[in-house]
Amino acid sequence: MADKITSRQEDYSQWYIDLVRSAKLADYSDVRGCMVIRPNGYAIWEKMQAALDGMFKQTGHVNAYFPMFIPESFIAKEAEHIEGFAPECAVVTHGGGEELAEKLYVRPTSETIIWSSYKKWIQSYRDLPILINQWANVVRWEMRTRLFLRTTEFLWQEGHTAHATPEEAQEEVIRMINIYRTFAEEYMAMPVIVGKKSESEKFAGADATYCIEAMMQDGKALQAGTSHNLGQNFAKAFDCQFQTKDGVLDYVWATSWGVSTRLIGALIMAHSDDKGLVLPPKLASRQVVIIPILKGNKDEVRARARFIAKTLNRHGIPTFVDDSENNSPGWKFAEYELQGIPVRIELGPRDLEQGKCIVARRDTFEKTELLLDDELTINIEEILNNIQQNLYDRALQFRLDNTVEATTWEEFKASVEKGFVIAHWDGTHETEALIKEETKATIRVIPTDEEYRQQYNMDEPGTCIRSGKPAAQKVVFAKAY
């Protein structure tokens, strides 16, 4: 019930944990650092999977599956890559009661094991491009965990593509980060900033990393998706060469890209409130709950509720009826608000007599009377569309209200405690590290979206916010999850 949830104002971190557990999205496991994704949480992941998988396939990608165990010799082939992941790796040393001749790493990501296969599959330009996605679990040994946001094992998708030219690879990188943006904004109703990571924040082993960054309700940033241009690094590590159209040998150009169950954490923190989960309808496996008020002629009310549910379901609006008599209508209202059901329909004997029902929105708690006629389905559909748009608009306005353009170091330090800060940066790793050390803020994204760049005059030369040296552009700083 919602009364178990700490308010956001009182303790945002505890609010998040309370909500995840009370809404039955996930729970802690007896395995340290791991979580159990409960049916309510997994239903959201299934909706995310279905939407993303469709978008991947529309752009020519296919699914495959590769082993979760990676030989140590494979990992060692890409030095920068393993250096980035070494502290997070889980290693298998024994199997079948014996010590293994070669250690096996439980995949923290799959570049190395996949490129060992690509080397066998690619001989000529005719074998390219390869556009493969994998839905899998990965393991990264986390010391400080938080449900959905940071766990030792998590679910994700990882795309791995191979190309004949650097131009094709770069096109793929941009295509995929734009797919993530579309998914975040159109399905999650979560506005994101698209751009590049700084050199120190990019993926280990990549030439460049592109990302989408979202603002949570506490003003912190959350990296919601990444797309990496791997250049020829992995192809060289695995000696993956192909014969070009000109008949010469060249190394393959590569990309990788992925999102994870971390998106569920982002979804929660972008929209939810002190009463519980708030879900955009497109990611709600159950969009409408009908609660009959069982007084007087119960059978007639029940029958009408089930008829309405059947009609809505037939029109593609997932609807269910809670006509149990174990709990009061008030208890049910609070419970389904906690679970984030976007629309609630209340139907009692008096409503039936008057040919109407009460419809309540989860996002605004606004109640409307609707006639029980042929227009009911259309009206419910319109309300669901309005909720989807309102959640996006609300989140975008929140980001606008909590984004500051800082021109002094004092202003920067004060503002970064509350949200995003746009400021000049001199482009050096030293200044970036100093800012992180003093404020815990990092460069979240160097925006590439032209509209965003113009909105904040990102290309305007100026003075670095920390070093005072000349700076060619502004970047987005924030504290992050």
From Swiss-Prot:
Broad class of where this protein is predominantly found: cytoplasm
UniProt keyword annotations, A-Z: Aminoacyl-tRNA synthetase, ATP-binding, Cytoplasm, Ligase, Nucleotide-binding, Protein biosynthesis
EC number, UniProt record: 6.1.1.15
Gene Ontology cellular component list: aminoacyl-tRNA synthetase multienzyme complex; cytoplasm
Molecular function GO terms recorded: ATP binding; proline-tRNA ligase activity
Catalytic activity, as annotated: tRNA(Pro) + L-proline + ATP = L-prolyl-tRNA(Pro) + AMP + diphosphate
Comment on protein domains: Consists of three domains: the N-terminal catalytic domain, the anticodon-binding domain and the C-terminal extension.
Described function: Catalyzes the attachment of proline to tRNA(Pro) in a two-step reaction: proline is first activated by ATP to form Pro-AMP and then transferred to the acceptor end of tRNA(Pro).
NCBIfam families: proS_fam_I (TIGR00408)
Protein name in the entry: Proline--tRNA ligase
Organism: Chlorobaculum tepidum (strain ATCC 49652 / DSM 12025 / NBRC 103806 / TLS)
